Amino acid sequence: MHFIFFGPSSGDAAERVKAAFTAVRSTGNFNWTFIFILAVVFYVYWTEIKNKNWDALIAGVALYSVHWLYEIMNAVIGYATGYPLWCVSADSTTFILLIGVSWELSMMFSMAGIISYKMLGDNPDKLIINKGKFKISMRLVGAIGMALLFALIESFLAGAENGAFIWVYPWWGVILVFITTYIPFFLAANYVPKFKPKAKKIFLLTLVGINILLLAFLIPFGII
């Protein structure tokens, strides 16, 4: 296992993707870790609800909603071109939700926003740099830092010998993952809780609604 910075992640990446397409939403690899992971997510969210940590909850839902929109678009790309930007293998998971996301990954992302927001500390608007008009807050630094960490972890997973995470396109890799995927994820987690109440509702309800509509339309038609 080693870091991969650009695709393809292996010599047989294209064949691994084709195999993964046949395993989407198959229960052939199901095991009981599925239930345990779900229980952990429930515990985390209900603990935040009990403690009335609404901003942390909003951060979690914001990132998770963006995550699902990205996964849907990635699956559409896979349907249209034959190869998604990223893909998970059937050998590495109990259940593939969409071509680019396994159950385990999705549940991790459901908690990633909460983790990111909590790491900002008691004063997320603290200015790390404050020089005249040039100001950088902890929210931005935290988002970039988490995005970099997750991009490096994905690079590591892409180098897994069992093809756990697959990149096919030679131009797709850690730099684009960092900039186009993880920075938006963690910007949503760190900044949406700061929105005014009406803006929060509009952002979350719109994104959740779009995701539900896309899933309800695209899955029955066999597109994703």
Feature map (PLM): residue ranges:
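Aromatic-rich, lipid-facing transmembrane alpha helices and their immediate juxtamembrane interface loops
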Residues: M1-I224
